[in-house]
């Protein structure tokens, strides 16, 4: 049964993504960052809804009393899967995700990343890349956006 549910999710995820895929690049090309972020949140909400209904995955937020949405902050997270990246798009209204530049090489997905409101870093750049990331993060926080960073980088097991 798990295989059937997984395949059903894969098919519906593909259909949902195809239905949404014209909107995000169009808004990005029109340079409408607010609407682009709203479209991304709509898409991630649909993906999380499918994963809940079909796979039984639930998003449970703990410590909400410590969440202060009136001011931007930095979220530091251990990267377990793609799921938490999607979840943060729902939990935090205006989040800027720090991601590795190599993801831009993935066909189609890379184009979306390049036009999404994200901070892309070259991990081979050492201190120069760190300085650029900090500079961009400061700029985004000044704009009122929170930052999500996975300091371990690629998925960790901690």
Task: Please identify what each model-predicted range represents.
Residues 1-60, 111-112, 116:
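A transmembrane-helix-recognition feature enriched in membrane-embedded lipid enzymes
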Residues 54-158:
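Soluble catalytic domains of membrane acyltransferases
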